[in-house]
């Protein structure tokens, strides 16, 4: 039974997405359906965490705009995600960057990996 589940999950995993890690700044192009219209909305921010693996993998992106912080969690293998662009690579030493929630301004900045 377990082999059947793993085989089904392996079919659903996307391979067209770039490699990105926690601390990277990414642009997520997400399809939004409003009535009969469909458009693409771009959400840019820092990746706070990546959870699980395989077909159920998710990642959370945080951005601060006009002094309001917004965190969105996206499923990696969702068909609603059109593409993910890595804007810059971040240098971090943690798997979950929850400490960024308490920081404001330049203190919330992640160093760039060269």
UniProtKB/Swiss-Prot annotation:
Disulfide bonds: none annotated. It holds the Pfam family Ribosomal_L19. InterPro entries: Ribosomal_bL19, Ribosomal_bL19_CS, Ribosomal_bL19_sf, Translation_prot_SH3-like_sf. GO terms for molecular function: structural constituent of ribosome. It comes from the Bacteria. The keyword GTP-binding does not apply. GO terms for cellular component: cytosolic large ribosomal subunit. One of its GO terms (biological process) is translation. Keywords: Ribonucleoprotein, Ribosomal protein. PROSITE patterns: RIBOSOMAL_L19 (PS01015). This protein is located at the 30S-50S ribosomal subunit interface and may play a role in the structure and function of the aminoacyl-tRNA binding site. Belongs to the bacterial ribosomal protein bL19 family. This is Large ribosomal subunit protein bL19. It comes from Clostridium botulinum (strain Hall / ATCC 3502 / NCTC 13319 / Type A).
């Amino acid at each position: 039974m377990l082999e059947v589940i793993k085989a089904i999950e392996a079919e659903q995993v996307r391979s067209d997405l770039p490699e990105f890690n926690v601390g990277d700044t990414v642009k997520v192009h997400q399809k939004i359906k409003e009535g009969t219209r469909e458009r693409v909305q771009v959400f840019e921010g820092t990746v706070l965490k990546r959870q699980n693996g395989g077909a159920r993998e998710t990642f959370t992106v945080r951005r601060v705009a006009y002094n309001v912080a917004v965190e969105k969690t996206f499923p990696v293998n969702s068909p609603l995600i059109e593409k993910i662009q890595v804007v810059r690579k971040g240098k971090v030493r943690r798997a979950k960057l929850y400490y960024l929630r308490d920081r404001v301004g330049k203190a919330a900045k992640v160093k760039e990996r060269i």
